[in-house]
Amino acid sequence: MANVAEVIPARLLDRAAERRAELAVPDGPLLVVNRDTHLGNIVAAEREPWLLIDPKAYLGEAAFDAGFLVMIQVQSDPTAEHAGAVVERTAAGSAVRADRARAWAFMRSMEEIVWAVQDEEPEDLRLHLAVAAALA
């Protein structure tokens, strides 16, 4: 298995350290956010149009969840231009600051990189490195 630090470019590691410092203090009131949001946990339902299953609730800022929405949209076209448009649109629709949504999306993509290395998934690794670079 590859070492995560050997796989991630120094520029992205440096950016992650900067983002960690920026995100250490929440922006706004603490809300219940979901630590395990992914498309496998969002299902169509009868009582609601969409239902989030298997939640992992934490207290955090609203931009944390917006960051996930940004990250999954950027996966379809991991370019800086597309990422910028997605960040602006998602932040506006979520009523959160765009810089915070971008920062959380970047950090979640870095987490995906770690998982891809651990799971030895080269395609996922390439995708999430591109997403992180687009959001950096």
Q: Which residue stretches match the model-derived regions?
A:
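Hydrophobic residue at the +6 position relative to the catalytic HRD Asp in the kinase catalytic loop
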Residues: 40-42
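Short, well-ordered beta-to-alpha junction loops that form the rim of enzyme active sites
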Residues: 35-37, 106
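ATP/Mg2+ or Mg2+-diphosphate-binding catalytic cores
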Residues: 3, 111-136
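A general structural motif at alpha-helix termini
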Residues: 16-17, 70, 105
